Amino acid sequence: MQLSDFEKFQNLVAMFFERARERGDAPFLSAKHDGAWRAITWREAADRVCLMAEALRGLGLKDGDRVALVSENRPEWCLADLAIMAAGLVTVPTYITNTERDHLHILENSGARAIIVSNAKLARPLLAAALRAPCAEHVIGIEPLRQAQSGTLTFHDWDGLLAGKAKNGAGAARAAVEARIAGIGRADTACIIYTSGTGGAPRGVMQHHGAILCNVDGAAHILANDFGWDEEVFLSFLPLSHAYEHTGGQYLPIGMGAQIFYAEGLEKLASNIEEVRPTLMVVVPRLFEVLRARIMKQVEKQGRVANYLMGRALAIGERQARGRHRLLDRPMDFLLEKSLRPKIRLRFGGRIKAMVSGGAPLNPDVGVFFESMGLTMLQGYGQTEAGPVISCNRPAAGIKMDTVGPPMKGVEVRIAEDGEILVRGELVMHGYWHNPAETARAIQDGWLHTGDIGHLDANGRIVITDRKKDMIVNDKGDNVSPQKVEGMLTLQPEIAQAMVSGDKRPYLVGLIVPDAEWAVEWAREQDEKFDLATLQGLPAFRNAIREAVDRVNGDLSVIEKVRQFTFADEAFSIENGEMTPSLKIRRHKIRERYGARIDALYKA
């Protein structure tokens, strides 16, 4: 395996088969069954991909047809994705949290002729949509669906399809697939990924093979040159239907010949990390915030010595983040390497090379926290329309947590007159599926208009200010970044989530979700019964949250200060539609629900 390999691959399936030939009987995809991790080897995976690809062609599917894929993260997700592409088809990854309405939009918009779904539970809303979508013809259940045949849909069993093609031998299937993929080029569409819709109905982003290969090439160069390329282990737990995990958690590991473990779920993530001991992790900022809060609470309970060491580690980390490396810090740095930091690293398995944050902006203080604990943090930047990774921090360029690093290999970046970040390169999508008007707005003269505002620092690293569409412009014409203020609010132990508003208004106001664990402790100390709705009506509780807001205001400029706030009825979540699957808040949905309450703050 060499870095030069990535430029020669014509498609993602060719890259996979090359790695499968090199890795042979080495473990590739691992998941837990009956309490034990079980692996599929590279050779076994390649055979199954070929058999399923031929089974899909056997259903009458033709080159370029779309196949929707609805499943939790598991080995079959990867196998299905590769098989769809090996059949000359196009994958349409779909979130397992989608409603019937969401599924219907994607099925009708993509024109998917076939659907692969993992189990009966996920099939319920999906099949209700499929029966209304005239394009859908075939449904394949990875697990038995126990579904009666319908007049418009034909149901198939995953294992049954594999067994049917295995009768002719895996060799015959391999030969057919090899011949077919020889005609698939880097410019051909690999998948249509629907954006999570922070601002409206999801649009289908057409990602071609070259876009993802360009991303894999750039990321592999960073990892190989800055950290060394060895026997890498990835733990996959972000949704594979999101471009970030699809590229960073699936195709990057494939390109590096790595082993992929599939987490059992967020509730078991901590124990899975300790068991799997990953070398690389791809994470979204919200999870880093949660992990930071948990570590701080646990250290707080361990007494004065642990708290003292934590304080010194953070102080040294903050100085180093500002470029101040003091000789006086070396003895304490040495002590921390022998005491606190190894314990923290063990929480992450003990052999992690780097943790990559992406999908949303990372609060610099969170990044500095993990760096202070001896864990290397790399913040990436991108969007589905760009493969999705545009840039990433790396040691060779100097890691600075208020930047998202320099553009990756093969990526051109320039800043427009209004501050918008523009991107050009093979990583840029070919457009939005069946949406030429939106495509023309997004891509002009070959440059992708990202909708993000930022600049390049003296070392060529990208600094993101905010989303162009999210930027608050107050009644005096001043620009305010809501993400900066929200990020500072949610670092307070009293506050779990926040959204600030203030467009065309004299000042900012906030919608706040109190931290549940903190609220339990507060109620116990105040001898109050814990009921969040009741607590939010107590003046003393509100004053405690006010103190947290005021702490943040002390570090903000006049136009950034949050003057008034109100409480949300419940946490923002994927289930209530107020967060995307990558855990970004959906501002338009939150405003729909709480708009009147927010507006009332200006009348108080």
Residue ranges and their predicted role:
Residues 8, 28-82, 99-104, 157-162, ...:
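Conserved AMP-binding/adenylate-forming core of the ANL superfamily
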Residues 213-233, 240-341:
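Conserved AMP-binding/adenylation subdomain of ANL enzymes
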